[in-house]
Curated annotation (Swiss-Prot):
PTM (free text): Photoregulated by reversible phosphorylation of its threonine residues.
Subunit structure: The LHC complex consists of chlorophyll a-b binding proteins.
Binding site for chlorophyll a 2: 105
Function: The light-harvesting complex (LHC) functions as a light receptor, it captures and delivers excitation energy to photosystems with which it is closely associated.
Protein name per Swiss-Prot or TrEMBL: Chlorophyll a-b binding protein AB10, chloroplastic
Amino acid sequence: MYIPRLSVSICLHPLLIYKIAKPSKLNPISSTLIVTAGFTMLKHAAKSKVSSSTCDRRVKYLGPFSGEWPSYLTGEFPGDYGWDTAGLSAYPETFAKNRELEVIHSRCAMSAALGCIFPELLSVMGQGFGEAVWFKAGAQIFSEGGLDYLGNPSLVHAQSILAIWTTKVILMGAVEGYRIARGPLGEVTDPLYPGSFDSLGLAEDTEAFAELKVKELKNGRLAMFSMFGFFVQAIVSRKDRLENLADHLGWTVNNNALSNVTNFVPGN
């Protein structure tokens, strides 16, 4: 809603009513409504004695049991729910670094989670491209035949892990270098959101863009937990994600995280 935003604006700018009403010719009814609303908001702000940062309606991470907000968490950035028990965001430089790491890792985790699940779904539907299990597909680089991208030897036939790492460092280094350096001409204003990629026009509206930032971070945090779960499943069960899910749904008591971890023997 736009009402809270209007309240904050008038609280921060007491002369706003005068500046708006002075150039225009308002009828007595409109003038009375504007002045009355303005003084009502100013009176409420003076009575509550709160700053503009507390005029928002942020959701707390534990609801009414969350306690007080840390003074340095003002709600300026997406995904801020007032949770920082370790004080990791107390210093602005550390907070900026951790925030950048979280956003970048979130995007990588979302892409990785999709890359782990999608080939398995295609394989189940009979549209597989070679090895569908993500950790087995990557391990093919160490086999005698090497690794075929998309299961097609006529595309990219990789046989050297060093060549793959070198290619990734060059490609990702160029992209990250452009982002961190804010472009060759300084055209990038925010390294976390460099822009120039919005073919669907999703970020044209300011409020919609702010909401998408929150959704990106929420889904990114879930994706990071998902990838951690994928790593543990691969080490413990040596099965793909869909097979693990089918085993769990088929016999939940015998196939769950606790039973797999307790029966896990490293090296076997």
